[in-house]
Amino acid sequence: MRLASRFGRYNSIRRERLLTDDELMQFVPSVFSGDKHESRSERYTYIPTINIINKLRDEGFQPFFACQSRVRDLGRREYSKHMLRLRREGHINGQEVPEIILLNSHDGSSSYQMIPGIFRFVCTNGLVCGNNFGEIRVPHKGDIVGQVIEGAYEVLGIFDKVTDNMEAMKEIHLNSDEQHLFGRAALMVRYEDENKTPVTPEQIITPRRWEDKQNDLWTTWQRVQENMIKGGLSGRSASGKNTRTRAITGIDGDIRINKALWVIAEQFRKWKS
């Protein structure tokens, strides 16, 4: 199952401290939207996302990343889709930090959605957990605030399972052939046709820093994720011209690739266990 929301290119901000309201207003003004879009019916319960964020803050959840999709219709800018990544007090620093991913819009294109994720500091990778860990959806009706708060705690309860799987992956060694297979599977997720991939599996599994030279499943996955999301790898197009892989700048694409890579990693974990 894919996310209902579809995002294009976006404005974003990430800090290694709590984001302020001024920063949110500058980069994600739709969080402060004063009303629903005119296309929404009377049954649509409108609550500004900032109200939800403030209630989550009261519960100890703080935003560290925020982004908003760009729209061609300026009349929809105040209602456009946005995403925030929040951390719980007491789980702010570390090599890998659990995050709650909150998505919403006020133009009818998205319900509130909450998905478990992980932020990895060494490479600033923002991971998204696969569907097998679950995600929470809250429609724009009824007690939205209460349901979102409840959903945040449900996602929080998933993190123990996420951490257990992550630690298990760190203990699984992959030989060169297995790493090549992981890279090949990842390329198929993005390009679908092996004949159209501009780079090789060897390139996609190559580390960008010495900390990522380990051969365990977790680190292999991180190398692949960073190379795919950030792009910049030299390769050849289907027509044989020199090219560079593009960074994935759309949130929908980021979510899709991240979820698919998590599924691949889970399959390798089960296969090697």
Which positions does each model-derived feature cover?
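Short amphipathic alpha-helical segments
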Residues: R15, Y44-N51, I144-Q147, G151-E154
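Functionally constrained cores in energy, signaling, and assembly domains
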Residues: T20-D21, S30, G34-D35, E59, ...
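Intrinsically disordered, low-complexity regions enriched in serine/threonine
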Residues: M1-R9, G90-V97, L102-S273
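Amphipathic, interaction-prone secondary-structure segments
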Residues: Y46-Y112
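Intrinsically disordered, low-complexity regulatory segments
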Residues: M1-I47, N54, D58, R70, ...
